[in-house]
Amino acid sequence: NMEGTIVIGEGEMDEAPMLYIGERLGTLNGPKFDIAVDPLEGTKFTANNEPNAFSVIAVANKGDLLSAPDTYMEKIAVGANLPKNLLDIDFGVEKNIKLLAKAKNKKISDLNVCVLKRPRHDEIVKVLTKMNVHINYIQDGDIAGVLSVIGEEPKNDIYYSTGGGPEGVLAAAALSCYGGQMQGRLVLNEEEKIRAKKLGIKDFNRKYNIDDMVRGDVIFCATGVTSGDLTKGVKDLGNEFEVTTFALHKSKKINKIITNIYNKWIRFQ
């Protein structure tokens, strides 16, 4: 008994048959929620049976999730237990890396930086290479890249790339449950600015901190399609499928893996 509104989905109403931005779900009575979804994060991974493809949803109270257009977003993300507002996109790569190394009491050469492997990041890579940090490239999967900075022994110290705007908000939902930090700024052409205006975005140069993207309590779930860093993939058990979900709830400090078994022959209406 709830009213959910899709704020991040499969596109605008004329682009998607379902889960479009603005679509309302539920009984339309009871509590109101924002819903952000990415039904398949990592389409290439799925097609090639490579790791880190999953289905993602985040749910927050009405008005608490940034409704980001399907455009690029500059992003930097780090884990928990660091000084607040430590990094800033406008500081530049070199200054941010030096600040991070000092805050983590690490040598710069011991830092691990996750970068989405794209030509647009060549300048970032040049600076990182000159600073002699470890660069861990990912081919796709922006959300998994951001989430590689979480945990007691994270794979990476920082995520530094320009990826999808909607994926940025979904990643911020999970990162906020861990007390991590993130900053993003939308990269918009003239046509995209028109779409952004429709979503209520007025300042096209605004830098969004994690509390701007996820303003309060949030639930985040990622269900594995292929096995990866977050979850196992779907497992065929003959007449059944085993499905694994990575679940977080910020206010209740829930962080757990949920495994469910589904009968292959049941059709969901």
For the regions a protein language model found, what residue spans apply to each?
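Short coil/turn connectors at secondary-structure junctions
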Residues: 1-3, 28-33, 41, 49-54, ...
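Flexible, acidic active-site loops/lids enriched in D/E/S/T/G that coordinate Mg2+ and/or position polar
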Residues: 1-62
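A short local loop/turn or secondary-structure capping micro-motif enriched for an aromatic residue
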Residues: 54-55, 75, 263-267
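Glycine-rich phosphate-binding loop plus the immediately following alpha-helix
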Residues: 61-100
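An extended, acidic
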Residues: 91-240, 244-249
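Extended hydrophobic packing segments that form well-structured cores
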Residues: 238-269
